């Protein structure tokens, strides 16, 4: 449970790496460092999924779909210093495309809360 190590991180990059390697269940992680760098990533370990892309429910019974270890911190989706100058999540989808495929496509708010923020 390395999450407590984020308080000793000196840079956004260090904090994101600690968050990625922490032993908690995956959840969104937003951080800012003393230099004003802001970022988003996933805190907790993400399994390397083989044989499916997460867009639809699927059976694991035949063995063609499986978990094969964990993603490395370098493979995690992340946002650093976005052009908008701000980051908010509000339980909504934060990334798309290849980055979304790594963490799944479902169970996100449709964006109304983001609009309110």
Residue spans for each PLM region:
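Accessory structured domains or lobes within enzymes
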Residues: 1-116
């Amino acid at each position: 449970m390395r999450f407590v190590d984020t308080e000793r991180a000196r840079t956004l990059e260090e904090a994101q790496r600690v968050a990625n390697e922490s032993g908690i269940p995956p959840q969104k992680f937003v951080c800012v460092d003393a230099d004003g760098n802001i970022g988003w990533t996933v805190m907790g370990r993400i399994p390397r999924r083989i044989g499916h892309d997460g867009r639809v429910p699927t059976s694991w019974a035949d063995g063609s779909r499986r978990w094969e270890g964990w993603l490395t911190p370098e493979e995690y989706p992340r946002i650093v210093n976005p052009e908008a100058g701000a980051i908010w999540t509000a339980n909504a989808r934060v990334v798309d495309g290849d980055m979304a495929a790594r963490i799944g496509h479902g169970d996100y708010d449709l964006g109304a809360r983001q609009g309110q923020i």
